[in-house]
Amino acid sequence: MRDTKKMLNRADELDDLYEAVRALIIPHVRAADEACSLKSAGQLHTDDTQRLQNVLVEPYPPKALQERFQFTLPDNEGNGKDGLMHLIRDVLRYSVNTWDQGFMDKLTSSTNPVGVISEIVLGILNTNVHVYHVAPALSVIEKVTGRTLAAYFGFNSPSAGGISCQGGSASNLTSLVVARNSLYPDCKLNGGSSYQFAIFTSCHGHFSMEKAAITCGMGLSSVVHVPVNDDGRMNVSALRELVIQAKAQGKTPLYVNATAGTTVLGVFDPLHEIKTICEEFGMWFHVDASWGGSIIFSAKHRHKLTGCELADSLTISPHKMLNVPMTCSFLLTNNLSSFYTANSLDAGYLFHDTEDDEVWDLANLTLQCGRRADSLKMALAWTYYGAAGFERRINHAFKMAAHLSSIIQKSPDFELVSPNPPPCLQVCFYYTPGGKMAKSEMETSRRTRAMVEKMVDRGFMFDFAPGPKGDFFRVVVNCETLLGTVEGLFKGLEAVGKQVV
């Protein structure tokens, strides 16, 4: 007979595992905190056993890491708490510690304490924010957060708001679907085979537009890359010429993607001028502000987003500049009804009729059914820091980027690619010992890559990008970056530069 009086002990089990994991993750973060005071030297320090302490990463190539990791999954019984702790310990050990000050590689960096808490809360709730009745509080939070964020960008109509998506690429993809189904409604039923659409984006824009074109069945050939000016901003005259050319070829100009904070140089496209072209030819105007959109919280820097209020849709990803945990992205608009018209379906098993005129079953606005409530992560960060706190953090990051840029500019051994101060938080530059560029692009690229690799052994991780003179350094500063980190980075670069020439 079944034991109907059997009790669950999940809370006790969770408490036990949480305390065990806490004993691993807190030292992981603390190690990064304690290492930050040493970054100003530009090199690693030794521990009591005279071993170099690289809190950032233990670098191994894939095959070597596989051999050391020895990760397998059990065929029969699980490994229990001991096996779990062993695996978590190894994951922490062999992962990049993004909490370390030396992580300056990508547009995303570490999260922060409130970010970790938000992930725990979402894990506890483990619900789907597709229909209101299974996620009432989270649905309200997403609606309010999306509406409030939209208002910051100048979207103030009664139907303004936004939805959260799983990253900037997902937001951009959703915007393209909404654009097609809004401007050409027959596509929702019949597909787009009756049209040869043309999508326009800067040649410095993110590759997610190509991915979106593939996903929507438009193909890579539908994406037209617009040249940029010397400053990296989209050339509006060239855009207009390319639109006219596309029409002459029998194509249907559908959509222009302007970028507010390009991936490499951090440049902001001229939004007002691009909007004028979109109006002239009846195209959807989207702004990809995944990276640069967060400066809307800064009175000092938000002028770079002038014209964003004219967009039909706008992407912002707080998991980048604001250190909200990945993933957290919003697609905002002045007209959420266009999202509903483009994406809603008659699924009676899921969506039930209500007397409320406002859409609360948020899956009707998105491309997804299963969707995590990432908006909570932004909401909790906003509650914790406040808009003023976001502003201070952003202004600090820009100050650090400008300081690094000034150090580079004053040195005879480096040459800036980005202006001083940079438009966003990327500082791009070449190594030019004695003021001389290498004799070939290949040699410049070799030096750049060799220096990047050597800097990992000094506790700094950053990237490089192709340029007209070969690969150049691309260092991304973030809201947590300290002055000593910036100065230590430069000292390290000076030292490793002498080793590669």
Curated annotation (Swiss-Prot):
UniProt-listed Pfam families: Pyridoxal_deC (PF00282)
GO terms (BP aspect): carboxylic acid metabolic process
Residues bound to substrate: K106, L107, T108, R474
Recorded phenotype for the gene knockout or disruption: Impairs the production of destruxins.
Chain positions with N6-(pyridoxal phosphate)lysine modification: K320
A GO MF term: pyridoxal phosphate binding
CC cofactor: pyridoxal 5'-phosphate
Pathway recorded for this protein: Secondary metabolite biosynthesis
Catalytic activity: L-aspartate + H(+) = beta-alanine + CO2
Lyase among keywords: yes
Keyword Lyase: yes
InterPro entries: PyrdxlP-dep_de-COase (IPR002129), PyrdxlP-dep_Trfase (IPR015424), PyrdxlP-dep_Trfase_major (IPR015421)
Cellular-component GO terms for this entry: cytoplasm
Enzyme class: lyase
Enzyme Commission no: 4.1.1.11
Keywords: Decarboxylase, Lyase, Pyridoxal phosphate
Cited function: L-aspartate decarboxylase; part of the gene cluster that mediates the biosynthesis of destruxins, insecticidal cyclic hexadepsipeptides which induce flaccid paralysis and visceral muscle contraction in insects through targeting the calcium channels and vacuolar-type ATPases. The aldo-keto reductase dtxS3 converts alpha-ketoisocaproic acid from deaminated leucine into alpha-hydroxyisocaproic acid (HIC), which is the first substrate for destruxin assembly by dtxS1.
Family per similarity comment: Belongs to the group II decarboxylase family.
PANTHER family, A to Z: CYSTEINE SULFINIC ACID DECARBOXYLASE, GLUTAMATE DECARBOXYLASE-RELATED
Official protein name in the record: L-aspartate decarboxylase dtxS4
Originating species: Metarhizium robertsii (strain ARSEF 23 / ATCC MYA-3075)
Name of the encoding gene: dtxS4
